[in-house]
């Protein structure tokens, strides 16, 4: 792959070829499109022509004709969705005629060919190449089968089958085959398959361009048709709204007037009947109430009378009984005084017994109360004792708990201290033994790896030198041929890169054109839908406002008309009521007068008939009477028949009127039904249909928005996932790199800290060892100095005694081999009591000294003032033979310990300041602690001098 890396890349770009349309839709003239049949009208015909047929075509449903082509859409229809060119490519070009192939070849050869197809496809997918080579190769195999050639014996088939077995490698053989099939065909079959592939691609491109132009024209035509349709709908809507307002208002006015009159008449009749019934009911109720109350009053009077009679009889009986009883008692009172005395004695005895019993009861009660209180006190005392015992137990328990808690806490503290000590020891061991040992082990491994790499590089260098010598021995012809091949390959690669760059430019131009076309279609759809919704919303709102205003005005007018009609009807009713009363009075008067006149006429007629009968009676006979009776009977029958005919005529007229009124009522009901209820139902149904249509459109729009949002969310989620994955990957790489750097830096810092601590502890151990050695040296010197001082003290005392005094004055000095002669005699003041204290003080003072320890025998220039005075006194008086002896200096241990620089008589390693140990390399106080340790590690004299 290293040799063919650039070739692989150029071939990959070569296989991803795209085609640019030969002519864009903006460059094609209108006349050419009309002649080719791609459009049916020119721009002038669209502007100046009528819009009726476009509206009809736009309102038709979209129906694809089965006889039309795959990409041919009828003009002025909505654009169909674009067809995936990859699927078309596979369907039109790459499908094998499997029936014919199986007819010519056996199953084994078909399986071999299909296996090779799958291997080629896997190879192209593995190296991220286009599948155009597979399509051309399939066309090539189909052409071979059609020509009667066995594809299994083909040269290129066998080469591909051999090369694609096992692992996929992009070598020069496959590159040459790709070049033959894609760029330079060597036989007519390959050229024919390549031509078929290019023809299919060009066909797809032409169909796409044709579909694009047709879609644009259909879009413009639909937009124009929609505008015209909106104008027509607006005009029709205005006409329909005017007519509906006109006819509905007239019908409503007539129906309202008729309904109001009918309601008034019916309500008046109901009111009259209601008033009459209420009057009758009130009259009957009053009568019933009066009858009931009258009966109650009568019953009460009878009851009181009965009670009065009964009470008078009872009172009389009781009075008689009481008077008789009183008389009887008075009569017996005279005879029964002894009985009265006995009764009073018994009463007195009862009183005495009662008092005695009362006193006994009081005593018993007090005794019982005292016993009760005593029991209560005993119970309370027992309860208090129990409580005190419980409290004592609680106290003991609390003390024990507190003690155990403290014991547990101290035990836990000790455990924690032990755990902390063990952890610190473990960390120290891990730091010292793991880190340092591991670092040394890694250094050794690194050294071994460097040595091995150097050996490998040496072998490689030797091999390269041998290879160079071998290539130098080759012929010049091979060298020139390789140079020629390289130059030709380089030129071919540059040409391929140029073609790929041109194809990429064409692809980007085509993609941008398709993107702009798609955006234009989407924006056109959105604008048309927005115009529709805005127009519908605008005029729907205006129509709703007008309908609400009309309804409110109709309600107000109907209310005003009803109020006026009620007032007019009440006025007419009042006038007619007055007239009816007057007419009733007149009618009654006329009836009375008419009755009087009829009575008078009948009386006069009777008188006249009687007079006529008296005049004509003698001349009339029976025959004449019978004839006259017959005539009268005929005349009366005629009159009766005539009256009956008149009554029948009146009855028929009344029946006709009733039938007419019934028919009128039925017609009126039907008219009301068709004018009012049907109109209301139609309006409600129309409103329901409008609302349903609006909701349907709104739902479709919402579904489109939701789908687009879901698609956008999916795209955004994928984009965000990819972006976050790349960010996460880079962040993870940075964290990994930083963690490696941090580990390296921490390892370096830990190594530095451990080295510092090891140096410090090694220096401390060296100091301790040196101090031990100096202490031994000091002890030897101190022993010698002590012996020397004791000898000198014994000599001075012996010389200063009066028994050993001499007359001559000599200079008494004891010379030691350690120090030189001094001008004055030196001694240690004090007595033998301070020897041990002095030795211990000097030991503790010079326990940490770093230089030579001075001798305990000091000169007068080094001793203090008291020692100087004593030495001077001894030198002046004692040695000159004075009779008085100077007192020895008194030793004060408190003063000496106070003047000492240190009171410690041994080396205490606990006084060495502790250095906090931590594994973290960011401790900023390492140098300060080291300085502090160095400062405290000095001797007391050096610290005093500072």
From Swiss-Prot:
Gene3D superfamilies: 1.20.5.1760, 6.10.250.1000. The modification Phosphoserine is found at residues 10, 855. Residues 846-901, 917-946 are annotated as: Disordered. GO terms for cellular component: cytoplasm; half bridge of spindle pole body; spindle pole. The keyword Secreted does not apply. Residues 857-883 have a biased composition (Polar residues). Residues 926-940 have a biased composition (Basic and acidic residues). It is found in: Cytoplasm, Cytoskeleton, Spindle pole. One of its GO terms (biological process) is spindle pole body duplication. Keywords: Cell cycle, Cell division, Cytoplasm, Cytoskeleton, Mitosis, Phosphoprotein. Its main location: cytoplasm. Forms a complex with CDC31 and interacts with SPC110. Associates with the spindle pole body half bridge. Component of the spindle pole body (SPB) half-bridge involved in the initial steps of SPB duplication. Belongs to the SFI1 family. This is Protein SFI1. It comes from Saccharomyces cerevisiae (strain ATCC 204508 / S288c).
